[in-house]
Amino acid sequence: MISTDQKRKLISSFVTGDDLSTSDPYDVWKTRFGCWSKKLYAKNRFIALPLVAAITIIDVYFNNTLRLAYKKQEYPIVRALSAQVLINLYQLDGDEQHLNTAKQHLDWLLSESCLGYSGPCWGLGFKWVVSDTLTYDENTPLTTATPYILEAFIRY
């Protein structure tokens, strides 16, 4: 049985790195081909269904482990959740290093916020096709990310 201290060290090892790049379950849909396929599907589901079904099956069952043709990426939500984990660890053991590393994540978030808005905000960090007429670019803030980041700043 793994001890509580060992669990904390294991968790800490995941959230203390300088580079938190990771794969995303939706990697296939942020590729140029994936975006094109989603737009086609949004325009005509009957024509595009075999294509997007094939893409999904290949990605889930054959490429899920290998992640071929996908590049790992830093995501604001990963940094925010890592900062919150470190704040939790600090509250448990009082180790200042957890708080220092949480601050590094928060500094990264400030430097990587979406540009051109009235205040800091964050999005996915990649193009996301919503419909055949609406595509969010890499710099579009979304409510799916910003609240977690705001919570990390408030808790710090």
What are these regions (language model features)?
Residues 1-156:
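Glycan-recognition and catalytic cores of secretory/periplasmic carbohydrate-active enzymes
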